[in-house]
Amino acid sequence: MSFFSDMNAAADRNNSLVCVGLDPDFKKLPECVKGAAKPFFEFNKAIVDATRDLVSCYKPQAAYYAGCGREDELLATIEYIHENAPGVPVILDVKRGDIGSTAEQYAREAFERYNADAVTVNPYMGYDTLKPFLDYADKGVIILCRISNPNSGDLQSLVCDGLPIYKHVAKLVRDKWNANGNAAIVVGATYPEELQELRQLCPELPFLVPGVGAQGGDVEKVVRFGCTADGKGLMINSSRGIIFAGKDDDFAEASRKAAMALRDQINSFRK
């Protein structure tokens, strides 16, 4: 099956549009896992066990692992999800963007080394930097469009030929870059009006939506403005708000409660 088939099946099975970001920070880990040989993996394992029936996908951010030499724990985490949360796909958040020959190696890294089901990429350098990822037709390729960070508008909101750059990106994805039906875009929850405009521009394109939880995005606006006509089409990501919901030995149960609360809040606004 393809990434989007698996993601939609998980969303239906778990009645959930929640994506959990697995972004461990050693300083914030509960004391009960800090002493483990692989503390990031043990932490992630507990989070996955507690939330796998509440989510549509997981999204580890690779920098949290690579920054401290724990790529082996990233790989172990993805393997664990595939084995113990079957049918719940994994987005590797790396935001790659480089010339074609280098992009080929980044695509191999994401899809062959890590066996991720989807990847985030940066379109700034154009289609030839995205093609190596898009050529993996059964994998998801999630393209940065309108991002949640405060200064994203420095470039994304610049107007060219009457449209902001982020709308040009969305149109390229919709009209030219999605030949395999495996593309999506990243649209931040912190810009709900732009989210609404992009949904009108791309009625069926899946959106990965970061920025709820710790970043303060409005869940109601995300759902009302971002869902497709069938009440789907969104992967609403929360990282810190779920994985660091608790600090003690019961951290996994706290993460479950946080994921369930977000799922139920989202569902209360779905059509």
Residue ranges of predicted features:
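Active-site beta-loop-alpha junctions enriched in small/polar residues
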Residues: G21-K27, A63-Y65, K95-I99, Y124, ...
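Short, well-ordered coil/turn segments that N-cap beta-strands
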Residues: N14-V18, D53-S56, P86-V88, D117, ...
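Conserved anion-binding
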Residues: D98-V186, E204
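Conserved N-terminal beta1-alpha1 strand-loop-helix module at the mouth
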Residues: M1-P60, Y65-G87, D250, R256-K271
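Short amphipathic alpha-helices and their capping/turn segments at secondary-structure boundaries
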Residues: M1-N14, V48, Y127-Y136, V219-T228
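N-terminal active-site wall of soluble small-molecule enzyme domains
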Residues: A62-E112, Y191-E194
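A C-terminal functional module that forms or caps the active site or interfaces directly
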Residues: A189-N237, G241
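Conserved, mostly hydrophobic/aromatic
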Residues: V20, Y58, D93, V119, ...
